[in-house]
Every structure is written in C-alpha cells, then in structure tokens.
C-alpha cells in the first residue's frame, strides 16, 4: 500500500473530457477476456495487454494500472436462436449472435514489478477509489461509436396521409384476384388510395418487374399514396405504403379508414406479398448472396497467420473485405508487419497511439498476419456447428482512417471502392516524408491521354491513378442467343425474375473482361475542343493508355445504373475473368516519330469560357426533384455538366459537406502554395495547377477534376514537349514491369446499391482460394470470379 501511496501523483481522476479505454489494448487486440487481461493506465487512461503494458511504463513512467479481467459464465449450449425480424446485427430483432456472458474482476497493479492490490478495498487511498470507480462506470471510448446496426431506417408518417382526399367512385376492392387495370400483371400490384385504381409497380432496368403503370398514374393525377396489395393484414403498420411525392415507404396512421373507403376489411386479409423491407431481408437467401458467400457449401474453417477474420462493427464489411486484400500484398505486409514491430510503431507514436495511423495500421497488420488471434474459439458456430474464430474488431483503425470523413466515420454502409481510394490517399499523405516506404505506390500507375486534332497534330495529358474503372459493354455479351431465349421463355410463362425457383433458370449477360479493357482503351470524341493549331473549336479524338504497369492492378467494374427516381441499381451481369491477363497492348508509347505537337497557348477568352458554369437544364431537373437551386448548381459544376445522373450522384454524396451552402465563387484572391504543391505532385504543370485552383475555389479535389475535364487548359501545358524529356516511370517513382497479371483478390458485393447490402473478399493464398466473410474465414470451393465488384491482380514478373 505504501508503494501505491508513493505514486499517487501519477494517478488522475478522469474528467468528462477524458477518453477512457478499457475494452481493447491500443497497440494490440488484447481485451479483458485475453489470458492476461487488460491494464488501464490510471494517468493517460490508455489500455494495454499483458505483453505490452511494460512498453508503456518504459515510455511514460506511469506505474499505476487498473487490471480488468473477464471470465466467461457458463450458459446452456442448447439456448435457442431467435429468428431475425430485422436486417440487423447486435440490435433487438436482429440476428442473434448467441454471445456468452462474462464476469468482470478488478485489481490495482503497480509496475514494474506487477505488485497487485485488491479492488474494491476500503484500504485504498480515496483518490484511487474515486479514479477507479470513474473508470469502471464510464462508457469506454471504444464503445462510444454507434452499436453495430445493419437495419433499415424507421418509416415516417407521410405528410399526405392526414389530408388525403379520397374520391367517391363506388369502387369496391375484392379480397383477392387482383389485376393491373392497364395490363395483365397479377403481382406487385399497388392500390392508389385516392381513386382506388389497381396498377402494377415499376419496371426494372433490364425489363423485369412491372410496367410502371402505378408511377405513371401518379404523374398524371398527382394522387400521392398507394398501398401494396398482398401486404395488408390485421397488422396495418406492416403494410407497404408508398408516397410518390416523398419517394419513400411511409406510415399512414389513417390506413384503416382509407381502406374502408374501398370496402376493404383489413382484419380478414392474408399476406401474400413481401414488403420492401422483407424483400431486402430475403436477399440474405437469394442466389447472389448464397453464391458469393458460398452458403450451403461445406466450407472448411482455416486458422493461422494470414487467416484472421474481422468483426463486423455494423456496416463495416466494406472495410473488412478491402483490408483483407490490402494486407495480402507484399507492400503492405512489408511496411506494417515484416519490417515494423508493434514496439517500434508504439515508440514512434504520439502520446495517444489510438490516433496515429501508422500505429493502427501496424496493429491491424500484426493482428491479421501474426496468427495470434486466428485460433478456434471455444464456442462453435451457432448455425453450422463448425469451429469458429472470434476475429478482431478493427475499431481503432476505423476511427483513425475515417477521421474527419463524414461518410466513413458514420455507421452507414459505404462503397468499398471509395474506401480503397480513401485508404490509398491517407497512406500516401502519411508517407510524404518517407516516400520510399509508401506501400500505396505499389498500386499507382501512369495514364497518358493522346488527343488527336483534325489538323493531324497531337497533345498528351499525363496523370497518375491507382484503379482502372471499367465500363461494361453489354453489347459484347457472349451469350446473346441464350439471353434472347431466356427472355422469350420468361415472357411466355408470364414470370418475373423474382419468381424463378432455381438460380439455373436465370440467364444473365456474360461479358469478357477483355472487352471491358478494350472499351477503356478505345478512341472517343471530345466535343467543343479548342485546337491551338486550327485556332477554333473542333472535335478531337482521345485515346488512353498506361505509361507504367503497377505491382498490383486494381480493376473496378462499373456495375451500377440509375433507375427511375434516380435510385442506384446494380447492373445484373457476369464478367468472365481469366486467372491471368496480359495488358501489354495497353501501354502508351508517348510522342512518336513523325507526330507534331499542338502549339502552345490557349487564348484567354477560351480559358475564361472554361470556367465552370452550371448547365441550366441539369439544374432545372434537379430542382424539380426538390433540391435547392444552389446545391443543384454546385452538383452540375462539380461534375462538369456530365448529366443529371452524375450530378445526382455528386449531390447525394456531398449533402453533408460543410461548405455545401457557401456561395459559388470562381475567384480566389490567394492560391495556397501547399495546394499548388499537391497538384504538382500529381504531375500537373504549375500554371495549370494555379488555373485549376482558381477555377475551383482552392479545392484540390475539384481542381483535379477541373484539369481532367478541361483538356483545353491542360494539353499545351502537360504535353510531352519532347520525347527525350518525358519522365520514365522509374524517374517518377512509379513501379513498372511487364503486362502479365495474375488474379489474387476479389471484392464481391451483394445488394441493390454500393451503399447497402454486404461485401465479401476472396483471396488466393498458398495456392487455394479463401473466403473472408467478416469474421468467418474458410477454404473457398467456388470463388465467384464472375461476380466481382473490384478485382485485384498481381504482376507476374
């Protein structure tokens, strides 16, 4: 006790502003449930596992720790699983994780000799008792994030329900036998609550679904509410009511009265159709979900180094799938595991290692690759009875990598591709002082755009990227005859795709990956291009190639289209991806003998005309959807007036931007030199960088887009003025080699859009494919190579 009293000055009583860690070690994934328990520093309130707490004592000199140990309680092994009613994890009504319960014990430990004192104890100094009580009763910093939730938003009461005017038409709706009033559809039918018309639902992008008669009726009449027939039962809140003006499923508190107007006795009706939310739940068992997750297959669990699962924190599968593949690359393994120990990263970290990206990447790398946390758990999988592993929660890493990012710091589902790009950018910026150690460079490559003017002269633009984003040319499908026969058969049977009983009955377009790559490299026209040779506007031809081939080639398949109502939907297509590809033909050759460069100089008036101005037609369409004029103008400008779909995508992803309501300004009195330097590092000329920053209000991301979308501004400044002066990939710091690549990683997506559903990774390890489905890791028997969203290839040489 005297030893404790002599160190009282190193004990703090936590203030409300203190971040208290007590659930997980800040440099490893040890927890109170680990064999050695967890040690909370009673000065900094950081937590450390048994093997690491001495490092903190050596670094800080803090000797007093609260030791927390959790011991599992015994529970009946035959505890029944609850059937889920929500697409959710860790919430009431969601999937039952069958989590065990634990008893918690405490003691005071004084380093360096690990002298232990019991807690609670009246003999402890009052300051220590108060400090420990505060820590024990506090909500841990690790748990202040939202509880893992994978659930639809709660429906709101429609503003149109309380004022709905129903027409006295004398229509009486029978309890069954419904048919669309304008076609022969007998399923997916909606009853308009104003006039009693029964009409079919929306048509899907591929021709399946309804014939749009219900939504067309709304456009003709402005009658706002409809209820889906077949979802009406005694539980009226479960009925699927849709508001067309609000473009969402809603609650109608007067639904019983509105149904009675058409003679419907809801108490006697039976459920025959799935609601929108239930259809989303049903995706868990449809073909795509089962195929990608390999459900129904006897997957053999695999354990050991490199086979550690990641716990789903709630809509974090996009992060898990991406990081599993990233930490299967030699560059990330070397940087954050092989050549950097946990102790080395901790010693370099600031006072709070939980906020240090290098520390948390090293922690994650060691957690995934050491094998320490990849062992069979004592508890078997509740659904299969197979051995399972608990996995590690990437909570601290997510907090650091998502800091100050409105979307990734939320608990909403995100696009795995967007996260990969965000990760690469953060790692690159963190490696500014040591670029030779930057693992993100292994994904980088140069892109060269050749612009051919009708005069015969050429210009060249160069930039760097880390993904190839590929359009999918459906007209290149190799199974057109099968597709035609399938659609004829389906039309003859009167079946919708949702009615298909077997996945084998569904025929989808099959497009070779080679066709997608060829489409990327093909020529495309540039309208309204100012030719400095012709001194006027003309149409130029642009072709794109790669100036270098990266160590790891990332291919993104553009699988999403916009449906009516600007709802993003997935393109229902298979991509035939070979195990080995050769992109040698895509290498750009640069300025060739006999080619003449376009002359320098673009008139000032042309530059002024390149200032971004919103397309009035795009703005008008967006405004008609209920968005503000200013927001719509910004969306059009920031997508270079590419179209309503592109502007809508930008608008939906930037609604929470802090400057979204700031006035549009094309003038910047002072250009920040650091922003110029950043653009220079991308390979842009200085005067182009300054023009771009001026045109985009100093925003680096917008300035980059401006350069790419304004070739008039960049050709004369970014061209290859001399074939001898052009930098080689080695001079620019980019990796390079041959064009042959081997497929080693696939991120697959299940769901109707990138912002919902589920992501899974398949990785080729030690000659076999392995599935990483959050914390489930097993040998893959049927990797979905044709269903990938993002493909990762490794250069063979």
Curated annotation (Swiss-Prot):
Keyword hit for Hydrolase: yes
One cellular-component annotation, GO: cytosol
InterPro entries, per the entry: Papain-like_cys_pep_sf, Peptidase_C19_UCH, Ub_carboxyl-term_hydrolase, UBA, UBA-like_sf, Ubiquitinyl_hydrolase, UBP13_Znf-UBP_var, USP_CS
UniProt GO BP: auxin-activated signaling pathway; cellular response to gibberellin stimulus; embryo development ending in seed dormancy; leaf morphogenesis; protein deubiquitination; proteolysis; regulation of cell population proliferation; root hair elongation
CDD domains with a match to the protein in the record: Peptidase_C19B, UBA1_atUBP14, UBA2_atUBP14
Domain USP: start-end pairs: 308-796
Tissue expression notes: Constitutively and ubiquitously expressed (at protein level).
SUPFAM superfamilies: Cysteine proteinases, RING/U-box, UBA-like
Zinc finger (UBP-type): 156-266
Domain of life: Eukaryota
Location of the active site: 317, 758
Known EC number: 3.4.19.12
Molecular function terms from GO: cysteine-type deubiquitinase activity; linear polyubiquitin binding; Met1-linked polyubiquitin deubiquitinase activity; zinc ion binding
PANTHER family: UBIQUITIN CARBOXYL-TERMINAL HYDROLASE (PTHR21646), UBIQUITIN CARBOXYL-TERMINAL HYDROLASE 14 (PTHR21646:SF10)
Record family assignment: Belongs to the peptidase C19 family.
Role, per record: Recognizes and hydrolyzes the peptide bond at the C-terminal Gly of ubiquitin. Involved in the processing of poly-ubiquitin precursors as well as that of ubiquitinated proteins. Involved in seed and embryo development.
Protein's recorded name: Ubiquitin carboxyl-terminal hydrolase 14
Provenance organism: Arabidopsis thaliana (Mouse-ear cress)
């Amino acid at each position: 006790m005297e030893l404790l009293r002599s160190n009282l000055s190193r004990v703090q009583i936590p203030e409300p502003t203190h971040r208290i860690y007590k659930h997980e070690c800040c440099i490893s994934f040890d927890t109170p449930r680990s064999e050695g328990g967890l040690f909370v520093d009673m000065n900094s309130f950081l937590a450390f596992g048994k093997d690491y707490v001495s490092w903190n004592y050596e670094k800080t000199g803090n000797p007093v720790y609260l030791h927390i140990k959790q011991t599992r309680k015994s529970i009946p092994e035959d505890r029944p699983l609850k059937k889920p009613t929500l697409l959710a994890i860790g919430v009431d009504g969601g999937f039952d994780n069958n989590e065990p319960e634990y008893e918690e014990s405490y003691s005071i430990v004084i380093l360096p000799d690990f002298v232990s004192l019991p807690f609670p104890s009246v003999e402890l100094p009052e300051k220590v008792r108060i400090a420990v009580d505060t820590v024990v009763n506090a909500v841990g910093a690790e748990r202040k994030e939202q509880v893992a939730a994978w659930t639809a938003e709660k429906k709101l009461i429609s503003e149109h329900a309380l004022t709905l005017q129903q027409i006295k038409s004398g229509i009486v709706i029978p309890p069954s036998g419904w048919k669309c009033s304008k076609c022969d559809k007998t399923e997916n039918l909606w009853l308009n609550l104003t006039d009693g018309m029964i009409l079919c639902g929306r048509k899907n992008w591929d021709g399946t679904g309804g014939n749009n008669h219900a939504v067309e009726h709304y456009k003709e009449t402005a009658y706002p509410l409809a209820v889906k027939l077949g979802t009406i039962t005694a539980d009226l809140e479960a009925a699927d009511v849709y508001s067309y003006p609000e473009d969402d499923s809603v609650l109608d508190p007067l639904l019983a009265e509105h149904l009675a107007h058409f003679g419907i006795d809801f108490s006697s009706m039976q459920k025959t159709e799935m609601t929108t939310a239930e259809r989303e739940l049903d995706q868990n068992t449809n073909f795509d979900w089962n195929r990608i997750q390999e459900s129904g297959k006897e997957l053999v669990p695999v354990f050991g180094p490199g086979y550690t699962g990641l716990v789903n924190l709630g809509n974090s599968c996009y992060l898990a799938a991406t990081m599993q593949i990233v930490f299967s690359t030699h560059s990330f393994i070397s940087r954050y595991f092989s050549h950097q120990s946990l102790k080395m990263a901790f010693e370099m970290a600031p006072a709070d290692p939980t906020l240090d990206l290098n520390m948390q990447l090293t922690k994650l790398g060691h957690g995934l690759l050491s094998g320490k946390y990849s062992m069979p758990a004592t508890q078997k999988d509740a659904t299969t009875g197979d051995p399972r592993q608990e996995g590690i929660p990437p909570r601290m890493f997510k907090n650091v990598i998502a800091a100050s990012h409105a979307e990734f710091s939320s608990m909403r589902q995100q696009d795995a591709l967007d996260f990969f790009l965000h990760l690469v950018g953060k790692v690159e910026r963190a490696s500014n002082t040591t670029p030779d150690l930057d693992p993100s460079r292994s994904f980088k490559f140069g892109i060269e755009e050749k612009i051919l003017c009708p005069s015969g002269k050429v210009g060249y633009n160069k930039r760097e990227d880390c993904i190839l984003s590929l359009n999918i040319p459906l007209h290149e499908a190799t199974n057109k005859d099968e597709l035609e026969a399938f659609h004829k058969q389906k039309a003859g049977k009167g079946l919708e795709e949702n009615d298909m009983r077997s996945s084998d009955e569904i025929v989808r377009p099959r497009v070779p990956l080679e066709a997608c790559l060829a489409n990327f490299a093909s020529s495309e026209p540039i309208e309204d291009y100012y030719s400095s040779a012709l001194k006027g506007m003309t149409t130029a031809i642009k072709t794109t190639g790669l100036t270098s081939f990266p160590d790891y080639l990332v291919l993104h398949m553009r699988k999403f289209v916009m449906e009516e109502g600007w709802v993003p939907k997935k393109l229902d297509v298979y991509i035939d991806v070979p195990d080995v590809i050769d992109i040698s033909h895509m290498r750009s050759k640069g300025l060739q003998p006999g080619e003449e460069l376009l002359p320098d100089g673009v008139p000032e008036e042309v530059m002024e005309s390149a200032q971004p101005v919103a397309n009035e037609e795009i703005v008008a369409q967006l405004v008609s959807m209920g968005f503000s004029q200013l927001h719509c103008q910004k969306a059009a400008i920031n997508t270079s007036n590419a179209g309503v779909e592109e502007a809508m995508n930008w608008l939906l992803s930037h609604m929470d931007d802090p400057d979204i309501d700031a006035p549009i300004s094309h003038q910047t009195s002072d250009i920040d030199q650091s922003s110029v330097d950043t653009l220079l590092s991308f390979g842009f000329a200085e005067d182009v960088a300054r023009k771009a920053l001026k045109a985009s209000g100093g925003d680096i991301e917008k300035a980059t887009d401006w350069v790419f979308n304004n070739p008039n501004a960049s050709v004369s400044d970014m061209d290859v003025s001399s074939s001898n002066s052009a930098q080689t990939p080695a001079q620019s710091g980019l990796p390079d080699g041959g064009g042959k690549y081997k497929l080693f990683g696939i991120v697959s997506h299940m769901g109707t859009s990138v912002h919902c559903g589920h992501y899974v990774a398949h990785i080729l390890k030690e000659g076999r494919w392995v599935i990483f489905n959050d914390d489930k890791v097993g040998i893959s028997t049927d990797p979905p190579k044709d269903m990938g969203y993002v493909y990762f290839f490794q250069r063979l040489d």
